[in-house]
């Protein structure tokens, strides 16, 4: 179990999880607001 925790805390695994979640977030934003140069919740 300790080896699995050590493996999951290495940089390539964490980078893969981080970039995967970031890509998913950007995809969902582009799905909700297609071709948006300004987002409605950022305009003041």
Curated annotation (Swiss-Prot):
GO cellular component: chloroplast thylakoid membrane; photosystem I
InterPro entries, per the entry: PSI_PsaJ (IPR002615), PSI_PsaJ_sf (IPR036062)
Alphabetically ordered keywords of this record: Chloroplast, Membrane, Photosynthesis, Photosystem I, Plastid, Thylakoid, Transmembrane, Transmembrane helix
Classification via Pfam families: PSI_PsaJ (PF01701)
Subcellular location field: Plastid, Chloroplast thylakoid membrane
Hydrolase among keywords: no
Keyword flag Manganese: no
Signal peptide: none
GO biological process, one term: photosynthesis
Membrane protein topology class: Single-pass membrane protein
Disulphide bonds in the chain: none
Membrane-spanning parts: 7-27
HAMAP family documented for this protein: PSI_PsaJ
Role this protein plays: May help in the organization of the PsaE and PsaF subunits.
Family: Belongs to the PsaJ family.
Name the record gives this protein: Photosystem I reaction center subunit IX
């Amino acid at each position: 179990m300790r080896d699995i925790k050590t493996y999951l805390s290495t940089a390539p695994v964490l980078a893969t999880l981080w970039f995967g979640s970031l890509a998913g977030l950007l995809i969902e934003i582009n799905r909700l607001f297609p071709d948006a140069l300004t987002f409605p919740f950022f305009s003041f």
